[in-house]
Structures are given as structure tokens and as C-alpha cells.
From Swiss-Prot:
The lineage of its organism: Bacteria, Pseudomonadati, Spirochaetota, Spirochaetia, Spirochaetales. Its EC number is 2.4.1.227. It is a peripheral membrane protein. HAMAP family: MurG. GO terms for molecular function: UDP-N-acetyl-D-glucosamine:N-acetylmuramoyl-L-alanyl-D-glutamyl-meso-2,6-diaminopimelyl-D-alanyl-D-alanine-diphosphoundecaprenol 4-beta-N-acetylglucosaminlytransferase activity; undecaprenyldiphospho-muramoylpentapeptide beta-N-acetylglucosaminyltransferase activity. This is UDP-N-acetylglucosamine--N-acetylmuramyl-(pentapeptide) pyrophosphoryl-undecaprenol N-acetylglucosamine transferase. The keyword RNA-binding does not apply. One of its GO terms (cellular component) is plasma membrane. It is an enzyme of class 2 (transferase). Pathway: Cell wall biogenesis; peptidoglycan biosynthesis. It is found in: Cell inner membrane. UDP-N-acetyl-alpha-D-glucosamine binds at residues 22-24, 179, 209, 312.
Amino acid sequence: MRFRARVSQSTAKCVVFTGGGTGGHIFPGIAVFQALAQQAAVRVVWIGAARGADRSIVESAGLEFCGITAGKWRRYASVRNFFDVFRVLVGTVQSYCILRALRPQALFSKGGFVSVPPCIAAWLLRIPVVTHESDISPGLATRINARFADRILVSYPHTSCYFPRARRAAVHCTGNPVRQDFFSAQAERAYQFLRIDQKKPLLTVLGGSSGARDLNARVLSCSTFLTERFYLVHQFGAGNEDQMHTITNSLSVNARHAYMSFPFIQAHLPDILAASALVLSRAGANAVWECAVLGKPMILFPLERGSSRGDQIENAEYFSAHGAACILRAQDEKGHQLVSLLTELFHPSCARIEEMARASYTLGIGNAAYDIAQQLQTFIKEGM
């Protein structure tokens, strides 16, 4: 199998990372890898799903990658749950072989269904397990992994109450890790990349790594208003090109220079957010914490419970309760509330957006990636 060729190296220090299924489980792990690489000469190998985008994202960040068979336990009745039990078993055996060959000092899990087999295998091999949860309420994978973890890291102080009392001594609050690029972001680079001036404020719309069709539809419904008042950067998501073309075609020729669309923004995202006066976004953990690190006010459009387990609603409510964000729900299909809210926030006499920016910055203070790397360092030193 492919992973055998990738684990033949030997090293005095090694840490294995795991997580995947979506970018939300990978990018924070990459942030921790970057911080760890600055602190120590450690070999890092990532165990992720053999199928999907895990490999390309991880390898593009400079990490070794080992793919395993991944199963997923769904919260609803499905015949696929039966077959995925066997996929998890296969993935556990594969993970066991990888970890036995590598003999790492620790395993760091960033969650997602693919992380469960490596955590089980590490526990069987008595390799210390450190797991991190980005959302307020832990997902199913984190709840399972926590049973095998020596240390449970969380992003919000009150997340500890979701774990059994016997496990709470192992819980530590670190915040959510974001890439080091966000700490050195420069607005001027964004203006140069986008080829825009500063005559109008920049508004950035983020729909997550796969985009958000309903959020795109709201942009379409008020595209003329948005491009008249703002420069608009729109991450519309791969596969949603039809909506992007519809938005572009709805604009006058003169207005199109104010609309800049991308299927996905990665390398330039920190600079673009640094230049943004306001961010319209889903309420995924990565998005809200990346905005907070840069002190950006947010209008959040969380996924409803019918489309998720409710984690985005919880994230949005937390940032809203602390004054860093406003929430717009699915009922605002035509964008009327969005137009009204933007008009209010950017009225010359309104100080609310500055207050939101200060609140966002306060929440984003700290460097979770560095703190988590420090936690991993304790296991590396103990394992020497």
C-alpha cells in the first residue's frame, strides 16, 4: 500500500497529525504544524482520508501524507453506517501499521471522521493523544477521540461542560488555531492584488471552502446596492460558477469593476481580510476566528440545524453575544435585512461597526497555534 513507502524514514522526534474530511479540520492543523516547526526540529506526518481533498491540501503545506480508508457515522439511519463500520476497522488497522512504523512521540487530532481510527490505534500503542475541538459543542468524532486522549484542547472556555466530569481535568482552553499568515497580514498587499483604491470600503463575502449557494443568492439579490457602496470580494465556491456569472451579468458595465469573484481564496485571504471593513460569512469556526485575529466585524449567516448539527449557530451566537458580529438567518432570502443592516452600520453617525471591530479583536487576542504546539512539546520532551 502507498503509505508503506512514506513511513520508511526514521527520526529521533516525530509527531503524527490527523484530521480531515473538510478544510475546517485541516487548516487549523496546518497552523499548529507551522507553529511547531518554529519551535523544534520535528518530523510531522499527517494521516488523512485516502479519498478526497485531504492529500492535496496537506502536501501543498509541505507535510508528509499517509492516506487511510475512512468511514463516517451519520446521525440518521442509513445503510451506509453498516458498511462504514468496516471502513473504520480497516482504517484502524492501517493507522496501527503506520504508527507502529513511525513510533511518534504524540498524535495530534484535529477532528473529523477520519481522525477516529488513528486515535484508537495510538491508544492501543500507548502513544499520547492530544485532540482539539474548534466548535463550542464537540462533534461526534471529538467525543469519541476524547475517550482515548491524554489532553483535550478546546476553543471556548465553557466547552469543557460537554465532556464527562471524569475527563474535565484533561481539558484545556487554547482558542482556535489560525495560520501564521494572519498575524503578518497587510492590507496594502490586498489593494495591490485586487487593483483597487480605498475610495470605497471593502466588503468580503466568504461561503466556506465549498461555497454557500444561499449566501450567493443574497449577494445576487442586492448586488447593485453592494457594488455601489462597496468594493466586493466574493468567494463563491467551486461548483457555483453559475451564480457568479448571474451576479456579474446583473451588474452594469461600470459596476463590474467593483465585483471581484473567486471560487476559493487561500494564499491572499489574510491580506484581503486585513483590508476588509466588514466580512459577510458562514459561521464556521475557522472563518470567525480568522476574522477575530484581524479584529474584523462580521455579519454571520450560520448553517441552520437542518443542514448541520447546529455548531455554526452556536459559534455565531457566541461572537454576537460578545459584540463582534451580527446574525442574519435564512429568513432573509431577498437580502432586505442585509441591505438595511449595512446601511445602518456604515452610516456616518453610527459607531457600532468600530465597536464590533474592537470586540472582535479582543476575542482574537492570543496565538492558539503556538499554545497547542507548546502542549505538544511537553510530550515530545517526555518521549525523548
